[in-house]
């Protein structure tokens, strides 16, 4: 039986003003509105290229999470923590939140791109479930990463409705 407390794991500062972190905050907010208890856990900001200290800290964090817990991990970290996933895939319910594949980031050199592609492929194939932010990302994960469509949920980002300003 799965633990009722959810863990949401992300690299760096959740209050960083980017679209990805805004999406993460919104997912947490909506899960809480649905009655879920969410424990947020910050990892090193060095992801997706963590050093040994960051990986050791990540291993310690994951080892402290109770067995059978649902752990949602932002893709900026999830795709770059192969060994952590190996150590925990049989005791935790791991959910990857993939905004887009890490190897598709701009500015990567070929060796960085290949490293991320290998690591993220392993990570996604060993996730219990994957949340993506678009139909396009879903299609990429199915076609290029061989992730089963049944393992993927599309949760589109949206905008809040506001009344029109009076003229």
Predicted features by range, described:
Residues 1-46, 67:
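N-terminal subdomain of nucleotide-sugar transferases
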Residues 22, 73, 132-133, 154:
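Short beta-strand scaffold positions
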Residues 44-62:
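N-terminal beta-loop-helix "entrance" segment that forms/cooperates
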Residues 45-47, 79-80, 97-112, 126:
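A short, histidine- and acid-enriched strand-loop-helix "catalytic/donor-clamping" loop
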Residues 58-82, 93-96:
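Short N-terminal targeting/anchoring amphipathic segment
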Residues 77-78, 136-138:
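Alpha-helix capping/helix-boundary segments
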Residues 111-132:
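Membrane-proximal helix-turn-helix segments that form the acceptor-binding/catalytic region
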Residues 136, 155-158:
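Carbohydrate-associated surface elements
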